[in-house]
From Swiss-Prot:
This is Venom nerve growth factor 2. Keywords: Cleavage on pair of basic residues, Disulfide bond, Glycoprotein, Growth factor, Lipid-binding, Metalloenzyme inhibitor, Metalloprotease inhibitor, Protease inhibitor, Secreted, Signal, Toxin. Residues 1-18 form the signal peptide. Expressed by the venom gland. Nerve growth factor is important for the development and maintenance of the sympathetic and sensory nervous systems. It stimulates division and differentiation of sympathetic and embryonic sensory neurons as well as basal forebrain cholinergic neurons in the brain. Its relevance in the snake venom is not clear. However, it has been shown to inhibit metalloproteinase-dependent proteolysis of platelet glycoprotein Ib alpha, suggesting a metalloproteinase inhibition to prevent metalloprotease autodigestion and/or protection against prey proteases. The keyword 4Fe-4S does not apply.
Amino acid sequence: MSMLCYTLIIAFLIGIWAAPKSEDNVPLGSPATSDLSDTSCAQTHEGLKTSRNTDQRHPAPKKAEDQELGSAANIIVNPKLFQKRRFQSPRALFSTQPPPLSRDEQSVEFLDNEDALNRNIRAKRENHPVHNRGEHSVCDSISVWVTNKTKATDIKGNMVTVMVDVNLNNEVYKQYFFETKCRNPNPNLLQSECRGIDSRLWNSYCTRTQTFVKALTMEGNQASWRFIRIDTACVCVIIRKTDNL
């Protein structure tokens, strides 16, 4: 009788030890084409190791530039990594399809609550335009989706490798960045003067400004989220001429 009890206890302990843990049964969230899930995760480690998706059946010689670019592409990413994504920006996007461009193919309009409330006002202005005045920006700019960013400067000032393509649940997602740059009307000049500035008193030029967005980067064989710099605006810099002081 005692042997039977011992046998049942041992079988029960073996069954508990062999049961799958809850961490192994975490459901894999399927991201949408416009963006990926931003669910917070209880785990606090910074990055998950990833494996490179290489095709050994048809090896081909690669140049040094191709090897450097390959470190930021064709990466299989664990979906749990996107559960820790925070501080999302509309200027950083993961998608399987190119983001939509505006009608002039130069800018994208992001509507917030204030813009939605002012749509009727803008429509009235378009229906009743004022012909005796011109509305121009101080500096000309162009906004585009950047699809091939492989290098960037992080928040610590270090150069990091940005992942171009990621393989998530057997589907390839591309990392897009919406950047605004200065558009120089005169290609012969490195910097253009600002519009509407009195050149008799001021020296002026247009320059880009940058901000930080959260991006998926690679460091060795580890993928993690980092803040990187991207161009977000074109502003005017004015300097008073010294001979007028």
